[in-house]
Amino acid sequence: MADPEGTNGAGMGCTGWFEVEAVIERRTGDNISEDEDETADDSGTDLLEFIDDSMENSIQADTEAARALFNIQEGEDDLNAVCALKRKFAACSQSAAEDVVDRAANPCRTSINKNKECTYRKRKIDELEDSGYGNTEVETQQMVQQVESQNGDTNLNDLESSGVGDDSEVSCETNVDSCENVTLQEISNVLHSSNTKANILYKFKEAYGISFMELVRPFKSDKTSCTDWCITGYGISPSVAESLKVLIKQHSLYTHLQCLTCDRGIIILLLIRFRCSKNRLTVAKLMSNLLSIPETCMVIEPPKLRSQTCALYWFRTAMSNISDVQGTTPEWIDRLTVLQHSFNDNIFDLSEMVQWAYDNELTDDSDIAYYYAQLADSNSNAAAFLKSNSQAKIVKDCGIMCRHYKKAEKRKMSIGQWIQSRCEKTNDGGNWRPIVQLLRYQNIEFTAFLGAFKKFLKGIPKKSCMLICGPANTGKSYFGMSLIQFLKGCVISCVNSKSHFWLQPLSDAKIGMIDDVTPISWTYIDDYMRNALDGNEISIDVKHRALVQLKCPPLLLTSNTNAGTDSRWPYLHSRLTVFEFKNPFPFDENGNPVYAINDENWKSFFSRTWCKLDLIEEEDKENHGGNISTFKCSAGENTRSLRS
């Protein structure tokens, strides 16, 4: 049997009854106080001041209402600030603000629509247009939750706790429209400030019917210089746009100006060629002063120079009445719009490029590619070269052919013809006396030097190797290098003597030089190069070819050791013609050499000593020195008609 509820130890003799002893506080006959007198009359005088009707309560209520309204206004201001900073959340923030105000004005609807809130919010987010940036939906949803949790719930709790009646609800309803208006204005300001370029491009396409970016080639760097620029400006006064036609003349060689109206004034399109190259920063500063608009209201890019469509646009609009054109039309527009140029640009002639490289004496592939590309504006063949997808192969083939032609031409010439060709390519105005004065300063007889130099140039056996020796800083290398530079000879170094190909440059040279020959190098020459010093036929190992047999060109050597008298190399004594430079090379007070030796001075020297050096050959006497013919590797154009 279950224990009786509320008892402990049932069945222990408890019958359920207990005795209570009364506590007596007042006995019969004691005086009764007025507060406990039940027989006294109740007149109600003691409740007169029970309700306080003073002004303090009304003031406190008004204060609480004001605080509630201030809290609502603070929430609206915070929401507007968030909308202004984050433009892509503007639509979502606006709906959140409406929900906050609606829930604040109608607290009863909050609990009813609480279950439908998540579904409705997700549908609103899905309907938003993507701005093109990543994670838009996730960030927007987070923004809505933050707005509701920070503003909506706080405002709702404040309204419920404040106890404000219908007046508070009316004030909330009247602020809904103002909140929406402020939000739209902030959104407009954000669009104009944060995405100005996109807004300008949109207005440009709306006004001109063509995308601005289709006419230009964007530059990433603001420091890149260019002479031609394409500019569009937005929000320009009509009077300023009209005055631009006159103000821009002093800065430009060519201008193409179009002006159309839009909702914020005039929007212009300007194609301009400046008198000198300018970068984007300089152009923006100049146009900002001329148009009286900030630099952010302009888009500045260089035009497309190889687009035929863009060139046709500028060509056609230049003939219409909406354009104001001044100056000479740029050559790239003419090249892309004239029919003959279009035909020529599609045809590339390698022989013409080889002829150009030959005439300009360019044999290095890098120089050929760089300088020929610069001719694209004036040479149709160079423009076709730039359009080719095989530029590297073309440059390589051009360099190879040019080097072959130059090598064959040099082999064909005698030493006299080669010196004559070098003199023709050197400017006049030189003086031969510094060379003679330097030889006399080093105590060298000019007549003896001239006789040895004559045999040296002709390559007479045992006389085709000249040694200039002496102490350091006497001008040995200065004298020898100046001669090699004038005659376009080759310089070989003994540091490469362990290579099989270190003598390869001698196969293409009319004269060679080994500078600063050391005792180790003299030993190598004595062991392996005696026949080379003789001027006889030698065999040279050349890359990618079989051994080449050729006559060694004259060799000019400089050294601090006189191998012509040193007993360590007795077999070189008869093979070397030795001249000693004993005196230090003189300099003036400014550090310039007293005896200046350059190409012009060597030209004057050979001109004065031409006969003494016996450089005139029989063919030169018959043809009066005009035996060198002009080389042509490209086919000439026949300008004669078929009937002639």
UniProtKB/Swiss-Prot annotation:
Binding positions (ATP): G470, P471, A472, N473, T474, G475, K476, S477
Region annotation (Required for E2 binding) ranges: 312-644
Protein origin, superkingdom: Viruses
Region (DNA-binding region): 179-345
Cross-link position per record: Glycyl lysine isopeptide (Lys-Gly) (interchain with G-Cter in SUMO): K551
Motif (Nuclear localization signal): 86-88
Catalytic reaction equation(s): Couples ATP hydrolysis with the unwinding of duplex DNA by translocating in the 3'-5' direction; ATP + H2O = ADP + phosphate + H(+)
Taxonomic source organism: Human papillomavirus 33
The protein, known as: Replication protein E1
Post-translational modification: Phosphorylated. Sumoylated.
Domain spans labelled SF3 helicase: 444-594
